[in-house]
Amino acid sequence: MHPNLCTICESMFTKVMKQKQVPIPITIMFADIRGYTDLSQHIEATELNKVLHSFYDRRSPAIWEKDAIINKFIGDAVLAIFNFPLTRNDHVANAVQAALQLQHNCQSLKEEIGLKGNQSLGVGIGIHTGECFMGEVGTAYKDFTAIGPVVNLASRLQGAAGAGEVLVTAEVFEHVKDQFPNAQSRKLTLKGVEHLVNGFVLS
């Protein structure tokens, strides 16, 4: 994590709060657990709780290590923002690396606890990049978050990603394509998106 995080965060958040909503190029990552229902049918509730907490403990560091913030938890899903408040020219590549590390951490956990083939637990991840507005939404209860189509598309990609998959848009893939010459391409019809989306599965 950046050593001057507190100072940088304070500066960036102060700027955004003064201007209400600020357009910023960012990369959005959504990650959600897959196989929770199936797993709950094979192990006791107390053991399931331990597994989930172990997973959560390994999820956050993969994101923080790439100078990103976890903006919110939505059920079992997490929304991470790259390039705010810490700005990085390589924020797109960082998001992809964080996603792959997260998948690695999840796989290591499965091996440690000895999950069998029919006791599946995995993560589906969606990543998109572009300009978003950072700011507060709401009146009585204010939520500081990223706003815009980029967020929605990243969320929809996550919903289309299978367990163990990192699914990214063409905009993201353009930044990392040299690292993934064998990436699988997909034409995706996503809810709330009027056009077909070119997606790529990275591993």
List PLM regions with ranges.
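Catalytic NTP-binding/metal-coordinating core of nucleotidyl cyclase/transferase enzymes
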Residues: 20-97
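Allosteric regulatory "coupling" segments in signal-transduction proteins
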Residues: 92, 143-147, 184, 188
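Regulatory cytosolic signal-relay segments
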Residues: 1-25, 180
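Cytosolic regulatory/linker segments at or just downstream of nucleotide-handling modules
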Residues: 163-203
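Catalytic/regulatory signature loops of cyclic-dinucleotide turnover enzymes
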Residues: 128, 149-170, 191
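Catalytic strand-loop-helix junctions within cyclic-nucleotide turnover domains
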Residues: 84-91, 125-144, 163
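Alpha-helical scaffold within the catalytic cores of cyclic-nucleotide enzymes
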Residues: 53-68, 85-125, 129, 149-151, ...
